[in-house]
Amino acid sequence: MMVILQRDEIISKLQAWHQQALDSEEIWRWALQSTAECVTEDVVIRAVMEMLCAIPQDLWVEEDAQVMIDALSNPVAQSDLSINLLWNYPDIVDLAGRRRTLHDHPLYGPYCGE
């Protein structure tokens, strides 16, 4: 039987990442495994899990967990708002700065080439 992903479970993982109790590689591996093994009809969960599965190549770091927590904390009735929040978020991230900062990092480094 497929396990259903729940918002509160994901929020607790995101909080652990945000507080650096989990590192980026750990939450990334968790997301890949959970996405393979679990199901959800929740569009916000899907959007957050897609972001988490792309941590290395999209250069998401622990500070980004907060916007995902905010999106998942909105009521399900406000899913459109949450999706817009997540979709617009990359536009405010300084990716060039992250590439410079993370180019020696074992997880992110391979994705930091120009």
Residue ranges of model-derived segments:
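Acidic, Ser/Pro/Thr-rich low-complexity regulatory regions
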Residues: 1-114
